[in-house]
């Protein structure tokens, strides 16, 4: 087994909630597919599994650290696509040793698509991410299995000449495992929930804040650190934004 890495995060108690940070809410799915499959230990900040919003304020962090009544979210796994996705990803990772301990190999990278493999003891798990609004096709190097199955959609694909040809829906991700080697998984809805309100403007925290300062705050919301370990995988605009959001320094 490989060395254990430090944990990865997309938000925490000091920064804006991921659902607020994402300009395209549909990217909630590919961001979290990456969080649960890239090398490292995934960390979810409480409440973000429900897709709650939280904007960084100048004078207070109260909006980042709300008191939640868990009774209000009792049926979130059934009714909230964000929660259903996080629960499914946790189950997949728990049952897939390669995602915990496997080596990493990049398979494909464009400005909107990204694919990589996690290999462990002869088992290859393939992860595909599509940040585009349209369906994407990928032709990827497979492992020794004759067939692969998606843990998120239950779709099956055959291995031909050592490769698999898969299609990935827009603004989504997939985790492909050798068919028969892993438990059966219930398909999940990949679309992020529609927020009741969206933070599209920045209100001044005091009367002295100018419109220019507010605009600067909006620009700052879209700036995130990029992990050195994934610099090669984050060298194009759309995927760079997603990977940078996924891995915290």
PLM region descriptions:
Residues 41, 60-61:
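Short helix/strand-capping turn motifs
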Residues 141-154:
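Solvent-exposed beta-hairpin/edge-strand motifs
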Residues 1-38, 50, 57, 99, ...:
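Alpha-amylase-like alpha-glycosidases and glucanotransferases acting on alpha-linked glucans and related
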Residues 107-142:
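Carbohydrate-binding surface patches
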Residues 188-249:
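Intrinsically disordered, low-complexity repeat and linker tracts
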């Amino acid at each position: 087994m490989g060395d254990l890495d430090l944990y990865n995060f997309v938000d925490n108690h000091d920064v804006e909630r991921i659902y607020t940070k994402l300009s395209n809410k549909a990217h909630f799915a590919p961001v979290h597919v990456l969080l649960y499959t890239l090398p490292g230990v995934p960390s979810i900040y409480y409440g973000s599994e429900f897709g709650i919003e939280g904007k960084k304020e100048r004078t207070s962090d109260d909006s980042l650290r709300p008191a939640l009544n868990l009774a209000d979210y009792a049926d979130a796994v059934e009714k909230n696509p964000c929660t259903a996705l996080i629960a499914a990803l946790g189950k997949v990772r728990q049952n897939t040793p390669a995602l915990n301990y496997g080596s990493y190999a990049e398979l494909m990278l464009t400005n909107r698509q990204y694919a990589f493999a996690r290999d462990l003891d002869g088992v290859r798990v393939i992860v595909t991410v599509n940040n585009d609004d349209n369906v994407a096709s990928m032709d990827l190097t497979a492992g020794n299995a004759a067939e692969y199955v998606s843990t998120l959609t239950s779709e099956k694909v055959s291995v031909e000449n050592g490769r698999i040809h898969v299609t990935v829906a827009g603004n989504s991700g997939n985790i492909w495992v050798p068919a028969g080697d892993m438990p059966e998984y219930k398909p999940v809805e990949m679309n992020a929930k529609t927020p009741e309100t969206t933070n599209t403007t920045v209100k001044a925290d005091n009367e002295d804040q100018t419109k220019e300062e507010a605009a600067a705050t909006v620009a700052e919301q879209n700036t995130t650190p990029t992990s050195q370990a994934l610099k090669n995988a984050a060298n194009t605009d759309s995927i760079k934004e997603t990977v940078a959001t996924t891995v915290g320094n």
